[in-house]
UniProtKB/Swiss-Prot annotation:
Enzymatic class: ligase
Pfam families: HGTP_anticodon, tRNA-synt_His
Species of origin: Moorella thermoacetica (strain ATCC 39073 / JCM 9320)
InterPro entries: aa-tRNA-synth_II (IPR006195), aa-tRNA-synth_II/BPL/LPL (IPR045864), Anticodon-bd (IPR004154), Anticodon-bd_dom_sf (IPR036621), His-tRNA-ligase (IPR015807), HisRS-like_core (IPR041715), HisRS/HisZ (IPR004516), HisRS_anticodon (IPR033656)
Gene name per UniProt: hisS
Subcellular localization, as worded in the UniProt entry: Cytoplasm
Molecular function, one GO term: transferase activity
Gene Ontology biological process terms in this record: histidyl-tRNA aminoacylation
The EC number(s) this enzyme carries: 6.1.1.21
PANTHER family attached to this UniProt entry: HISTIDINE--TRNA LIGASE, MITOCHONDRIAL-RELATED, HISTIDYL-TRNA SYNTHETASE
Name this polypeptide is given: Histidine--tRNA ligase
Top-level taxon of the source organism: Bacteria
Family per record: Belongs to the class-II aminoacyl-tRNA synthetase family.
Main location: cytoplasm
Length: 423
């Protein structure tokens, strides 16, 4: 057990890290293009934050949270999602005082207890954005566009945007009563979880994955048919903005998302043809969440995207990001009197922004060259006693097999120019 990772977790090995760099760098790049700034919150929070913020009828709170009592007898929970912690930070630090809107993004690990499967781990990673301070439907469209932009920059294809409105506190009560009236005669046919949701939050039954429950709600009254004029107008404008951006979408009246805080716009992004884990992200508007967590009446909208699912989708589509490479230059030594000069050369290469390394296992010249190819390195700079005495080094291009002598004093500049020319 000491040498086995916990079930539902993964080690990201060095050769896999390059894929994560690509995802994280793309997320940061596209977020900044849209005017979002990074925020980092603790990986654990007070349990009450998620009970109140995520909702006690959600699957997350009911059965997926990693909760523990610390030595101060405080109930703490490893964060299962990113929105509630960001909202907590927004309230705690009075970020609205700095001027609205406030547009933030985050990257980091989340934790949910569930059955591990491909693309669905107990420790997983999310990229998310949260925008506070505006009810403008254009902001909804911007948030959706940012998510779609992220995916397309990675090369993902066959994306489907599912869109719905889940209403607001003004129009949901009427739909709630219609839905309960429809479900009441078939209450005993619902799964035990949905039977428990019937009184507390029947809208969540639309989100149930049970085939029996899905069949029952197939003809159920949807919240879209009960929208108040404000919600209906808002939803119409969101669609207009998406059309103006050329973003195609599917109206999905059964889409409610799995969290209780959503109001008005809800969306989910799926990839066709990748099996059960076709949903790779989603989000929506939460105009009451900031106030519910003790802040002012500040509206918000955001999304959370699972990065493991993105990697799975890229792999299935043959668009998998390239693995992390080795180094640009391996400094190879021949003889015992060149170690200090080689070490100085290594430092000079790194100072010039060139990824460089050397052999620390005292291999032979032949062994070092094999190591350079296996690393892999683009070039080997070979420094021997005879070359050092003449102030020269040999530079070998490992891909082409060509080799030339270069003055030792000029080799760093030589390598820098090679890098600038694309090697």
């Amino acid at each position: 057990m000491l040498t086995s990772r916990p079930r539902g977790t993964e080690d990201i090995l060095p050769e896999e890290v390059g894929r994560w760099y690509l995802l994280e760098n793309t997320a940061r790049e596209v977020s900044r293009l849209y005017g979002y700034r990074e925020i980092r919150t603790p990986i654990f929070e007070h349990t009450e934050l998620f009970n109140r913020g995520v909702g006690d009828t959600s699957d997350i709170v009911e059965k997926e949270m990693y909760t523990f009592i610390d030595r101060g007898d405080r109930s703490l929970t490893l964060r299962p999602e990113g929105t509630a912690p960001v909202v907590r930070a927004f309230v705690e630090h009075s970020l609205e005082a700095r001027g609205l809107p406030v547009k933030l993004f985050y990257l980091g690990p989340m934790f949910r207890y569930g059955r591990p499967q491909a693309g669905r781990l107990r420790q997983f990673h999310q990229f998310g954005v949260e925008a506070f301070g505006s009810r403008d439907p254009a902001l909804d469209a911007e948030v959706i566009a940012l998510a779609m932009d992220f995916y397309t920059r990675l090369g993902l294809k066959d994306l489907e945007l599912h869109l719905n409105s889940v209403g607001c506190p003004a129009c949901r009560p009427a739909h709630r009563e219609k839905l309960k009236a429809y479900l009441r005669p078939r209450l005993e046919e619902l799964c035990p979880t949905c039977q428990g949701r019937f009184e507390r939050n029947p809208l969540r039954i639309f989100d149930c994955k049970s085939p029996a429950c899905q069949e029952i709600v197939r003809e159920a009254p949807t919240v879209t048919a009960s929208l108040c004029p404000d919600c209906a107008g808002h939803f119409h404008r969101v669609q207009e903005y998406l059309k103006a951006l050329g973003i195609e979408f599917i109206l999905d009246e059964h889409l409610v998302r799995g969290l209780d805080y959503y109001t008005k716009t809800a969306f989910e992004i799926m990839v066709k043809g990748i099996g059960a884990q076709s949903s790779i992200g989603g989000g929506g508007r939460y105009d009451g969440l900031v106030a519910a967590l003790g802040g002012k009446q500040v509206p918000g909208i955001g999304f959370g995207l699972g990065l493991e699912r993105v990697l799975l989708a890229l792999e299935i589509q043959g668009q998998e990001p390239p693995p992390e490479g080795g180094v640009d230059v391996l400094v190879v030594t021949a003889g015992t009197g060149v170690d200090l000069a080689a070490f100085r050369l290594l430092a000079g290469l790194r100072a010039a922004g060139i990824r460089a390394d050397k052999d620390y296992l005292e291999r032979s010249l032949k062994g070092q060259m094999k190591y350079a190819n296996r690393y892999p390195a683009r070039m080997a700079v070979i420094l021997g006693e005879e070359e050092l005495a003449r102030g020269r080094v040999s530079v070998r291009r490992l891909d082409a097999g060509s080799q030339e002598e270069v003055p030792l004093a000029a080799v760093v500049d030589y390598c820098r120019k090679m890098k600038e020319s694309g090697w």
